[in-house]
From Swiss-Prot:
The gene is ufe1. Residues 316-319 are lumenal. This is Syntaxin ufe1. The keyword Transmembrane helix applies. The chain crosses the membrane at residues 298-315. It is found in: Endoplasmic reticulum membrane. Residues 228-290 form the t-SNARE coiled-coil homology domain. GO terms for molecular function: SNAP receptor activity. Keywords: Coiled coil, Endoplasmic reticulum, ER-Golgi transport, Membrane, Protein transport, Transmembrane, Transmembrane helix, Transport. Belongs to the syntaxin family.
Length: 319
């Protein structure tokens, strides 16, 4: 087949079409499966882009927030807007929770699509020998191609979702490690700081009234309560972060298991397609052999009848 690429480019030049100004059209699928798959794909891509844009603000060492200055949701902000963003610990936890919920929702939707593929696969008749392939090969091929395509779509969606969960897990892990490093540095500074004349001296509780007034003691108690609350809040955040990391690990395990199942299903479909091809090839060979046998029989009968005709003519002349 000759290449007509140059002819195509010539036609586009003659048409004076500016490809850059052609408006993009949203893909419209008549197949509900593909429409749902495209919607899940769009959600996953938006999550991945958001995590990459929010990475800088998420990992900043800040304890205050300026999110209220934004006029639109975080998902719709540009990279420049998010780079100037300041987040507190609560908002970081909210981002993790929202992304984890979106990942779980995508997993649930993909599971529904898997049930559709299983139902489609169950409708394909079992093959037993080459005669089964000769009954209606075009119809069987269409069904199997559709199932194989849908399985490939599921595999691709699960692969994308695995990438998103890996990015989120990496961000959470970095946040946890940095928090642990800061606490270790502060602890080392307090324990290794050499004692001097300004170092704190432990005062017996019975002598506190001598060194401090009642108001000073109340202020110290209040400061101590605040420090305890901050410590408890930090420990609670650590527990929540650990729980979130465990949830992400669980999600990754589920996605990996589903990817393995989809890979096995794709390999099975590929083997089935090869078996169909072998069956069709065997059927074609049988047809060729049958055709060859029938042609040989016809030639043999033609020769026999020709010889008999000649004999009859000869006998007629003799008589």
């Amino acid at each position: 087949m000759t290449s007509r690429t140059n002819e195509f480019f010539g036609l586009t030049k003659n048409g004076d079409i500016d490809a850059a100004n052609i408006p993009l059209k949203r893909i419209s699928y008549t197949d509900p499966f593909l429409a749902e798959g495209y919607r899940i794909h769009e959600t996953i891509v938006n999550l991945l882009v958001f995590l990459k844009k929010i990475r800088g603000a998420y990992l900043k060492d800040r304890t205050f927030s300026n999110v209220q200055r934004l006029s639109k949701p975080l998902m719709e902000c540009s990279l420049e807007e998010l780079s100037k963003l300041e987040l507190d610990e609560v908002q970081r936890d909210e981002i993790e929770h929202e992304v984890s919920s979106a990942i779980s929702s995508c997993i649930h939707q993909i599971a529904k699509l898997q049930e559709i593929v299983k139902e489609q696969q169950s409708q394909i008749p079992k093959k037993s020998g080459w005669l089964q392939g000769l009954r209606d090969p075009s119809k069987l091929s269409k069904k199997e191609t559709l199932v194989a395509h849908h399985s490939s779509v599921l595999w691709y969606l699960q692969s994308e979702l695995s990438d998103v969960s890996s990015v989120l897990y990496h961000l959470q892990d970095l946040r946890l490690k940095r928090g642990q490093e800061k606490r270790n540095i502060a602890s080392d500074f307090l324990t290794k700081n050499p004692t001097d004349e300004n170092s704190a001296v432990e005062i017996p509780e019975s002598e506190l009234q001598t060194f401090f007034t009642q108001q000073q003691l109340q202020e110290l108690e209040q400061e101590n309560d605040v420090l305890l609350q901050e410590f408890e809040h930090t420990m609670e955040r650590l527990r929540d972060t650990g729980k979130s990391l465990a949830d992400i690990t669980r999600l990754q395990s589920e996605i990996s298991a589903q990817l393995s199942i989809q890979s096995s299903a794709a390999e099975k479909l590929y083997d089935d397609a090869l078996n169909v091809m072998d069956s069709l090839s065997g059927g074609n060979q049988q047809l060729i052999k049958a055709k060859s046998r029938s042609s040989r029989t016809a030639r043999l009968l033609f020769c026999i009848f020709t010889v008999m005709g000649l004999l009859l003519l000869s006998l007629d002349r003799i008589v």
